[in-house]
């Protein structure tokens, strides 16, 4: 079953912007990620869910898209994400926790795939 979820996880560059993801589903994805392993069990990562059209529009200019496609500014209006989960490291709790963000991001992606997103 886990293998099937991993197979579902892909990099997406276009989304269904008009399909809202309920806040409670996003919060459940974050809660799942919160249970993932972290260096020294420090749990230094913090999360912010953005899921209103205004919040998504505000953050969009700051998102880097597709590192290999240098001339692409990201998805067009109508193809942008309808929600974001921002992950930040609380440096007061722990430094050099950069590997935790990858574990956490994949856990969120797996939780999203399990819910049928992606």
Predicted regions and their residues:
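N-terminal amphipathic, basic helical "cap/leader" segment at the start of enzyme domains
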Residues: 1-84
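Small-aliphatic-rich amphipathic alpha-helix that forms the alpha element of a beta-alpha
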Residues: 29, 33, 85, 91-118
């Amino acid at each position: 079953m886990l293998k099937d979820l991993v197979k579902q996880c892909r990099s997406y560059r276009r989304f269904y912007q008009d399909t809202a993801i309920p806040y409670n589903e996003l919060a459940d994805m974050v809660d799942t990620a919160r249970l993932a392993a972290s260096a020294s069990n420090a749990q230094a990562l913090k999360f912010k869910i953005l899921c209103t059209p205004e919040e998504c529009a505000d953050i969009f200019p700051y998102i880097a898209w597709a590192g290999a496609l240098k001339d692409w500014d990201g998805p067009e209006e109508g193809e942008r994400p309808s929600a974001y989960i921002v992950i930040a490291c609380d440096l007061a709790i722990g430094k050099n926790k950069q590997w935790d963000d990858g574990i956490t991001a994949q856990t969120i992606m797996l939780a999203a795939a399990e819910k049928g997103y992606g």
